[in-house]
Amino acid sequence: MEAHLDQEMILVLDFGGQYNQLITRRIRDLGVYSELHSHKITAAEVKDIAPAGIIFSGGPRSVYAEDAYRCDPEIFDLGIPIFGICYGMQLMSQHFGGTVERAGHREYGKATLTLNDPSPMYANLPLEQTVWMSHSDLVTSVPNGFVVDGTNVSCPIASIKNEELKMYGVQYHPEVNHTMFGKELLKNFLFEVCQCTGDWSMENFIEIEIAKIKEEVGDKKVLCALSGGVDSSVVAALIHAAIGDQLTCMFVDHGLLRKGEAESVMKTFADHFHMNVIKIDAQDRFLNKLKGISDPEQKRKIIGNEFVYVFDEEASKLTDMDFLAQGTLYTDIIESGTDTAQTIKSHHNVGGLPEDMQFKLIEPINTLFKDEVRELGKELGLSDEIVWRQPFPGPGLGIRVLGEITDEKLEIVRESDFILRDEIKKAGLEREIWQYFTVLPPLRSVGVMGDERTYDYAVGIRAVTSIDGMTSDWARIPWDVLEKISVRIVNEVQNVNRVLYDVTSKPPSTIEWE
């Protein structure tokens, strides 16, 4: 992932911690651009990026172990301010000659931090504050030149500083909400230590991205994959703002869309925005490929590959089509696995592309989280209907029908999902609930309808609250609204006699079921 040129940024090095993406988000929320990069990045690469500051993330390993994640030691010699969090503080301490050992017991949860001669990192903060600890190791002796400026009963070296080198470390996690003044600590690192200006905004992002798209594309043409979701819609609007009629949008109706989706896409982009939109009817082609396939990863790969093959075939009929634009998000890349994390699930936008694909990929929003994409859509002048459209995965209903896909199952999900969205909107909850949809598990149950025994499908409802999709909680939909949804589904959708409600957060679950 490329850093944005001519723009101050904070570089976050990924050492595998569960809160790493939160660090990046917190920094952006403070008006400074930030990106998460592998700990394997070289000092030369860091120098080229020229960040205003560097943050070492937390991580699950021990710095003294053979399999410890390390960074290029020359990064410490670049003269760039460094802030180490948890594992990051331990790594920095070890590098400069400090000692890191196994703690007597793991410390996890809230703790009280007491400050002594605090650094600029703690400017205007109380000398005693609540922080969030999550560690099994601790620094037992600080390196020469470093001073302890924060202690805790269970962790005597909870915060360290070397003001001459502008290097700071904390054993706790300022990026989580449980740390009372965590946001203020990060703010002080950005503005007191790194001297950032805090001028990053979505308006600024648009200006930079339009310039980048113009430079990258030149006088060539771009083919944009429209899916009907907010991500591809925003990508189309952004690229159209940059290159106008050099953009052609292709909308593939793969038979896995929500009710009314195809008509809505054509009306919005072809009629309202006057974009060049080509509609491809490929329902039979996709569904034939998916016959007999139950494994979710296989389904994702098949749908992703078939998308590209269709585009490849259709684009060959067009002239000078060099680029394929996709609505890949930052969360897509993160969830598809990094050096330090296992793949949770492959995303259609970052996996399954054939090696002989004729296009060069252009992914202008792949550094943004979902809520930032919505903000971008507003800045680009998209309607609320588009901006607040429910998130919809590229594989569509193909991963909301669990197991093998059939026409009957697709119709059940399509109709039940329409009812859910309709009732949520009627209840005025569409802005309060981050994402909501129905799924069809491979499950039948006994029921009674009209004095007759039934043996029909159970429909699952998934509704979550979230900010960026990295974590989420199940939505507390009022009981009366759930009752209306349930009654309508079992009465209006054929072959359904039961409705289930998913009350699991992320983690441990993902938002989508497949």
From Swiss-Prot:
Residues 200-389 form the GMPS ATP-PPase domain. Catalyzes the synthesis of GMP from XMP. It holds the Pfam family NAD_synthase. The keyword Oxidoreductase does not apply. It is an enzyme of class 6 (ligase). GO terms for molecular function: ATP binding; GMP synthase activity. Homodimer. Residues 9-199 form the Glutamine amidotransferase type-1 domain. NCBIfam families: guaA_Cterm, guaA_Nterm, PRK00074.1. InterPro entries: Class_I_gatase-like (IPR029062), GATASE (IPR017926), GMP_synth_C (IPR001674), GMP_synth_GATase (IPR004739), GMP_synthase (IPR022955), GMPS_ATP_PPase_dom (IPR025777), NAD/GMP_synthase (IPR022310), Rossmann-like_a/b/a_fold (IPR014729). It catalyses: XMP + L-glutamine + ATP + H2O = GMP + L-glutamate + AMP + diphosphate + 2 H(+). It comes from Exiguobacterium sibiricum (strain DSM 17290 / CCUG 55495 / CIP 109462 / JCM 13490 / 255-15). PANTHER family: GMP SYNTHASE [GLUTAMINE-HYDROLYZING] (PTHR11922:SF2), GMP SYNTHASE-RELATED (PTHR11922). Pathway: Purine metabolism; GMP biosynthesis; GMP from XMP (L-Gln route): step 1/1. One of its GO terms (cellular component) is cytosol. Keywords: ATP-binding, Glutamine amidotransferase, GMP biosynthesis, Ligase, Nucleotide-binding, Purine biosynthesis. This is GMP synthase [glutamine-hydrolyzing]. ATP binds at S227, G228, G229, V230, D231, S232, S233. Its EC number is 6.3.5.2. The active site is at C86 (nucleophile), H173, E175.
